[in-house]
UniProtKB/Swiss-Prot annotation:
It comes from Pyricularia oryzae (strain 70-15 / ATCC MYA-4617 / FGSC 8958). The COPII coat is composed of at least 5 proteins: the SEC23/24 complex, the SEC13/31 complex, and the protein SAR1. SEC13 and SEC31 make a 2:2 tetramer that forms the edge element of the COPII outer coat. The tetramer self-assembles in multiple copies to form the complete polyhedral cage. Interacts (via WD 8) with SEC13. GO terms for biological process: COPII-coated vesicle cargo loading; endoplasmic reticulum organization; protein transport. Residues 474-503, 792-1162 are annotated as: Disordered. Residues 879-892 have a biased composition (Gly residues). Residues 796-828, 1054-1063, 1086-1105, 1145-1156 have a biased composition (Low complexity). The gene is SEC31. It holds the Pfam family SRA1. Residues 933-948, 1071-1085, 1106-1144 have a biased composition (Pro residues). WD repeats lie at residues 5-47, 66-110, 119-159, 165-205, 208-251, 255-295, 298-338, 380-408. One of its GO terms (molecular function) is structural molecule activity. Belongs to the WD repeat SEC31 family. This is Protein transport protein SEC31. Residues 485-497 have a biased composition (Acidic residues).
Length: 1269
């Protein structure tokens, strides 16, 4: 890593979001005091000037503006049309949210300050712009206040949560990187809350071990994973959570010695994370594996903020309370010889003024190149018809790696550019008809002619009428009606027949006119009757006469009484349909419909026009679509064009097209889909036709290359689809979906077409078609980003050009390790205060959460540590591990006192042999060596060792005052070596009822030379050591200790056996004196585990709530600065020598199933009946189960699928068990639920090893089936 620039400020900061030259904005940090005790508060902008060789290490601000309150946090939003440099938002100490225009700040305009909003009642601790919707801003502050702002309406935010729900302060807020309406907050209460803006409620809460949360970061690639940092000095860890299993963290990152204050997850490479905290360190991690790559140079005060550059992840910045913001890079280089000499040139005169200004040296090299660097060879098509190719060149062994870049020009087809421009101009002019006619003239197939002809008809004012005419079924050409006849004779009518629909409308109120032509009185019978008052005729009649039938009299009486419904019913039963229609006209529409239905039902099987008329009358054209002969599809289409309602017309056309497509009539089906505006249906046919036409054209046109033919064919398809969308005014209803798109094949063509036109320099046209693709569609994001980068104006980069001409610099060599040395590996956390007993022969259960290989720093060949039995040490009980307690490694100590002053520089002298160095090799990420002499700066002198007043104690600077219950800031506890051959895995000892007190030290190798570390677990006393001072004080019982009297149940989170044996030789005598003793033994803890002499079986261990197990061989502890004590008595013990452990066998990969989940094609014959019965019954239950039980039904289905997967793979379930399950299934089918339940209990009790998660599903199915009718 290289320190590129330094900003001399104690301030909150943020990176500029654009891709141009990097700029940093800073605001005076709240809660900090400058070296000159200035109370001035400023917002400043800093240009890094990375391309300026004359720029020194320290920068000067390029813009500055005063503020009336200090900052807790700053965010810089992306640029937009109104704000080309983006918006800067400040979280102020006085509770205000201030916004500034970055462009105006840079130009020095007086109106750079945009707004101030004061909704918070206390300080705003954190804020962040939504990465997916930049206009949305979230702020979090004291008293649990969380507000969501729209920067376009900044004065009207809304609040998430209520004042009563969260009384603790919120310290951080972070938006999800994949889902725009999800964000998370963390605060002093120890909880992480995940919020959903759609519901404006909290959707999930994570328990951060009841420790405060200082920072949150979402996984850049996985929307369900996030990191939380803990600022507590007793638990300085980073948790990785998966929201799909929120009960416990997925991984714990441990490496900081004091609280973690900030984390930053690289958006371009999810394998890179930086964190910083109260231990003055900035560590680089791989959060996916928990591996610690290394750390940046250690500074002299707390580092409270660290952030990757959002667009150039090579750069990162770290802010600390020593008054600097350091800009650094991941690339490595050789240390400057002149700078190293300057560090040793201090004299006593300026020691106190310069000792705390120089960071401690540290370096590391990434084990693999970052994701954006992993490009050994590649090619990229540039816009404007260029292709850039880079590749490595062969070099002699031992020579630096070199690459060459070549740029060449290409052109797919010169006609494509002109054709695209001509088509876009016609679309803009709205001249769709000329486009259709042009394509009709040049059509090469019947399918293409039909498609363009239909689209031409759709352009007309009355498209349905045009479609009917295109089918050759226009109303003017309909056949004339036959001669009408009566009983008295035939009379010809020469009236012209009107179109079908017009005729239907005209006679809608007189549908029965043809039924009365058989009357003997002629057409003018009723017309001759007078309707005026007092009219009298010469035709008297009897209402009820002797000649009438009983039916006629009944109808007459019903009509006289106005009971038309009864009269109609009598006429229908007597098959007098004409009379029924006449009476129904007096009774209303319902009676008319009743008579129509009765008549059409009675004439079933009669001529087809009656059935067609019935479908039209009843608005049931689906009968025509599905049941009419498919050979008459044109007539069916004409009927739909005439009578279908607008809202039903597209679906009816689609159904008719599906019938045609099933018969193989692709062209006719395409016609129906086009008329119905079903783009998702017709586009598949067009793409198939495109591929066929492309193959034929490739065979015919031998001169053209295949891609040129493909490009022209794709151009024709895009034009066809574009015209169709304009004609039908098509709106893509699936543009907001995230999966299962019906137009996925069209989206692929859009992306491909955009690439082609962009290669010809037509970027705006490419952007137009990419906007038609959903935002979350795979492949569209890359194309959009490339267009965005191409259209973004970026400044010149002379530094990059000069870097290409610079000679290769000397590189750091690969470090040579001494013989037998193995690099240390990051270890998970240990169960605190657990002491290892002698190895046991019994093998504990396998632990899937076991730690990796043990540390090579553990001393070999020594006996396990056995504490001396004194009157103050209780017996060693056996306990069980917690549900997800810390695994072996560096544990936590008791609560440590936090002091405001930073700790003094640590002694980083390693006790082990440092690796050798050479100067002639290089690393992958070296940068050219800067030969220019660095500017003079202050440096840290070497501190003379302080003689120790105690025998056998290493000299060094005394640590700051600490709690008497804490050990010194010493080394991390090393894991043990693996067990010797022939021995069973060791078992972890039980934790002490009362944890060991500080002041009992041994010797252990310190942390590697990057920086001195701190451990939170007190060291144990050396064997045989005695104390001539007071006894240690009694400790208050912990309410969190585990208290089972019998061995607790097996726990799959127990630590790996390989980490449970601690070996080491006796350490030297001498230690920090213990605190004053109490006069009685420690009080009994009613919640603590009862002391037991035998270990728990099966690797079941109890967690200790405080620190790591005491280790033999730890260094003696230094006394507090003010202690006036003499050395304790005791003999010396030989120091253990670190020796490398034997290599560990690689763990076997997990066994893969024979067939994938969900496959049911390999179920044996003996189990097929079982699967069929259970599946059938499960479907029955699922169909009838209440909606409130849907989760239970879904879980039962999932568990039954586990059983089916086992049967399909012929694993786990034995043949005799399959027979029992067959009997159980038959009992369920016979509804013998009592027998089925007895069989289930028998299988579960006798075949436990075969019963996985599926047995619960069987049990639930029996209960649900019994309760479902």
């Amino acid at each position: 890593m290289v320190r590129l620039r330094e900003i001399p400020r104690t301030a909150a900061f943020a990176w500029s979001p654009d891709t141009s030259a990097p700029i940093v904005v800073t605001g005076t940090r709240a809660g900090a005091v400058d070296a000159d005790f200035s109370d001035e508060t400023k917002l400043e902008l800093w240009d890094l000037k990375l391309d300026d060789e004359g720029q020194g290490l320290e920068l000067q601000p390029i813009a500055s503006i005063s503020a009336d309150s200090r900052f807790f946090d700053i965010a810089w939003g992306p640029p937009n049309e109104d704000h080309p440099r983006g918006i800067i938002a400040g979280a102020l100490e006085n509770g205000s949210l201030d916004l500034w225009d970055a462009e105006k700040l840079l130009s020095g305009a007086s109106d750079a300050h945009m707004s101030r909003t004061t909704k918070h009642t206390g300080a705003i601790k954190s804020l962040q712009f939504n990465p997916l919707k930049p206009q949305i801003l979230a702020t979090a502050g004291t008293k649990g206040e969380l507000f969501i702002y729209d920067v376009n309406d900044i004065s009207n935010p809304f609040r998430l949560g209520t004042a009563a729900a969260r009384s603790d302060d919120l310290e951080c807020v972070a938006w999800n990187r994949k889902v725009p309406h999800i964000l998370a907050t963390g605060g002093s209460g120890g909880f992480v809350t995940v919020w959903d803006l759609k519901t404006r409620k909290a959707s999930l809460t994570l328990n951060n071990s009841r420790k405060a949360v200082s920072a949150i970061a979402w996984d850049p690639n996985n929307s369900t994973k996030l990191l939380t940092a803990t600022p507590d000095d007793t638990m300085p860890v980073i948790f990785l959570w998966d929201l799909r299993n929120s009960n416990a963290p997925e991984r714990t990152l441990q490496g900081h010695e004091q609280g973690v204050l900030s984390v930053s997850w690289c958006q371009q490479d999810s394998d890179l994370l930086i964190s910083c905290g109260k231990d003055n360190r900035t560590i680089v991690w791989n959060p996916q594996t928990g591996e610690r790559y290394g750390e940046f140079p250690e500074v002299t005060n707390w580092t409270f903020s660290a952030r990757f550059n959002p667009t150039n992840p090579n750069l990162s910045a770290t802010a600390s309370f020593d008054g600097k913001i350091t800009i650094q890079t991941l690339q490595n280089t050789n240390p400057s010889a002149t700078q190293a000499a300057a560090q040793n040139s201090l004299d006593g005169e300026d020691f106190f003024t310069k000792a705390q200004t120089q960071p401690q040296g540290a370096s590391f090299t990434l084990t693999k190149a970052p994701l954006w660097y992993q490009r050994p060879v590649g090619a990229s098509f540039g816009f404007g018809g260029k292709v850039v190719v880079f590749k490595q060149t062969q070099t002699a062994p031992g020579q630096p790696r070199a690459s060459e870049i070549s740029i060449s020009h290409f052109s797919v087809d010169s006609e494509i550019g002109s054709a695209t421009e001509k088509f876009e101009e016609s679309i803009k002019a709205g001249d769709l008809k000329s486009i259709c006619q042009s394509h009709l003239e040049n059509a090469k197939s019947e399918d293409e002619t039909t498609a363009w002809k239909v689209m031409e008809t759709l352009v007309a004012e009355n498209p349905r009428k045009q479609v009917v005419e295109y089918l050759g079924l226009s109303a003017e050409e309909a056949p004339a009606s036959p001669e009408s006849t009566t009983e008295e004779g035939a009379e010809k009518e020469d009236a012209e027949v009107e179109p079908v629909k017009e005729s239907f409308k005209k006679h809608k109120k007189n549908r029965l006119s043809t039924f009365f032509t058989e009357g003997g009185d002629g057409d003018d019978f009723l017309a001759g009757l007078a309707a005026t008052k007092g009219a009298k005729t010469d035709s008297p009649f009897h209402l009820l006469r002797e000649g009438n039938t009983g039916l006629e009299d009944s109808v007459t009486r019903a009509i006289m009484l106005g009971n038309f419904a009864k009269a109609v019913e009598i006429c229908i039963k007597a098959d007098r349909i004409a009379d029924a229609f006449l009476i129904a006209n007096c009774g209303g529409k319902e009676l008319v419909d009743q008579v129509q239905t009765a008549y059409i039902s009675a004439k079933k099987g009669s001529p087809s026009y009656l059935r067609l008329l019935g479908s039209v009358i009843n608005d049931n054209l689906w009968d025509v679509v599905y049941n009419a002969d498919i050979a008459d599809w044109k007539e069916t289409m004409a009927t739909l064009c005439t009578f279908a309602k607008p809202e039903e017309f597209p679906d009816l056309c689609e159904a008719l097209g599906d019938r045609l497509f099933e018969t193989g009539s692709r062209q006719d089906a395409s016609f129906c889909f086009l008329v119905g505006s079903k783009l998702e249906k017709v586009v598949g046919i067009w793409i198939d036709a495109l591929e066929e036409a492309e193959k034929n054209e490739i065979q015919e046109a031998e001169a053209d290359n295949t891609f040129s033919v493909h490009a022209r064919s794709l151009q024709q398809l895009i034009e066809k689809v574009t015209v169709f969308r304009h004609v039908t005014k098509f709106q893509d209803a699936e543009a907001s979906k995230t999966s299962d798109w019906k137009l996925a094949s069209l989206y692929d063509k859009y992306i491909e077409y955009a690439d082609i036109v962009a290669a010809h320099g037509q970027l705006s046209i490419a952007q137009k078609y990419l906007e038609l693709v959903p935002a979350s569609y795979s492949g569209a994001e890359v194309a959009r980003k490339r267009l965005q980068l191409a259209t973004t104006k970026s400044g010149a980069q002379p530094a990059a050009a000069r870097a290409q001409q610079a000679p290769a610099a000397a590189r750091l060599p690969t470090r040579q390790q001494p013989v037998g040395y193995q690099p240390p590996q990051q270890q998970p956390m240990s169960t605190p205060y657990g002491m290892p007993p002698a190895p046991q022969a019994q093998t504990p259960a396998a632990n899937p959460y076991g730690p990796p290989a043990p540390s090579p720093y553990a001393p070999a060949g020594a006996t396990p540590y056995q504490p001396q039995q004194t009157s103050y040490a209780p017996p060693q009980p056996a306990g069980g591990a917690g549900a997800y307690g810390p695994t072996p490694g560096v544990g936590y100590g008791q609560p440590q006192q936090n002091f405001g002053a930073p700790p003094p520089p640590r002694n980083a002298t390693p006790s082990a042999l440092p690796p050798s160095r050479t100067v002639d090799a290089g690393s992958w990420n070296d940068v050219p060596m800067v030969t220019k002499a660095p500017p003079p700066r202050r440096s840290t002198p070497s501190v003379a060792p302080v003689p120790s007043p105690f025998a056998n104690q290493q000299a060094g600077m005394a640590p700051p005052p600490q709690s008497p219950y804490l050990g010194q800031r010493g080394t991390a506890t090393p894991p043990p070596p693996p067990p010797k051959a022939g021995q069973g895995p060791p078992r972890m000892a039980s934790p002490l009822t009362s944890p060991p007190q500080a002041g009992y030290g041994g010797a252990a190798p310190p942390r590697p030379a990057s920086a001195a570390s701190s451990t939170y677990a007190p060291p144990p006393p050396a064997p045989g050591q005695s104390f001539g001072m007071n006894a240690p004080p009694a400790r208050t019982a912990s309410p969190y200790s585990v208290a089972p009297a019998a061995p607790p149940p097996s726990n799959r989170y127990a630590p790996s056996p390989a980490m449970q044996q601690q070996q080491g030789g006796p350490g030297p005598a001498g230690s920090m004196p213990p605190p004053p003793a109490m006069s009685r033994p420690p009080p009994t803890n009613p919640y603590a585990a009862a002391p037991q002499q035998s270990p728990a079986p099966g690797g079941q261990y109890a967690p200790s709530p405080y620190g790591a197990p005491p280790q033999a061989g730890q260094p003696p502890m230094a006394p507090p600065p003010s202690s006036q004590v003499g050395p304790p008595p005791g003999g010396r013990g030989p120091l253990s020598t670190p020796t490398p452990p034997p290599p560990r066998a690689a763990a076997a990969p997990p066994a893969k199933t024979k067939y994938p989940p969900g496959d049911r094609s390999h179920i044996p014959a003996s189990a097929q009946q079982l699967v069929e019965i259970l599946s059938r019954d499960m479907e029955r239950v699922a169909a009838k189960a209440p909606a409130s039980f849907a989760p239970h039904v879904k879980d039962t289905q999932k568990r039954l699928n586990y059983l089916f997967d086992h049967l399909n793979n012929e694993e786990l379930v034995k043949p005799d068990t399959i027979g029992q399950l067959n009997t159980l299934a038959q009992a369920i089918e016979a509804k013998d639920y009592a027998g089925a339940q007895q069989l289930q209990i028998k299988i579960q009790t006798e075949k436990t090893e075969e019963c996985g998660q599926w047995i619960v599903g069987v049990k639930r199915l029996i209960s649900m089936s019994k309760a479902t009718p």
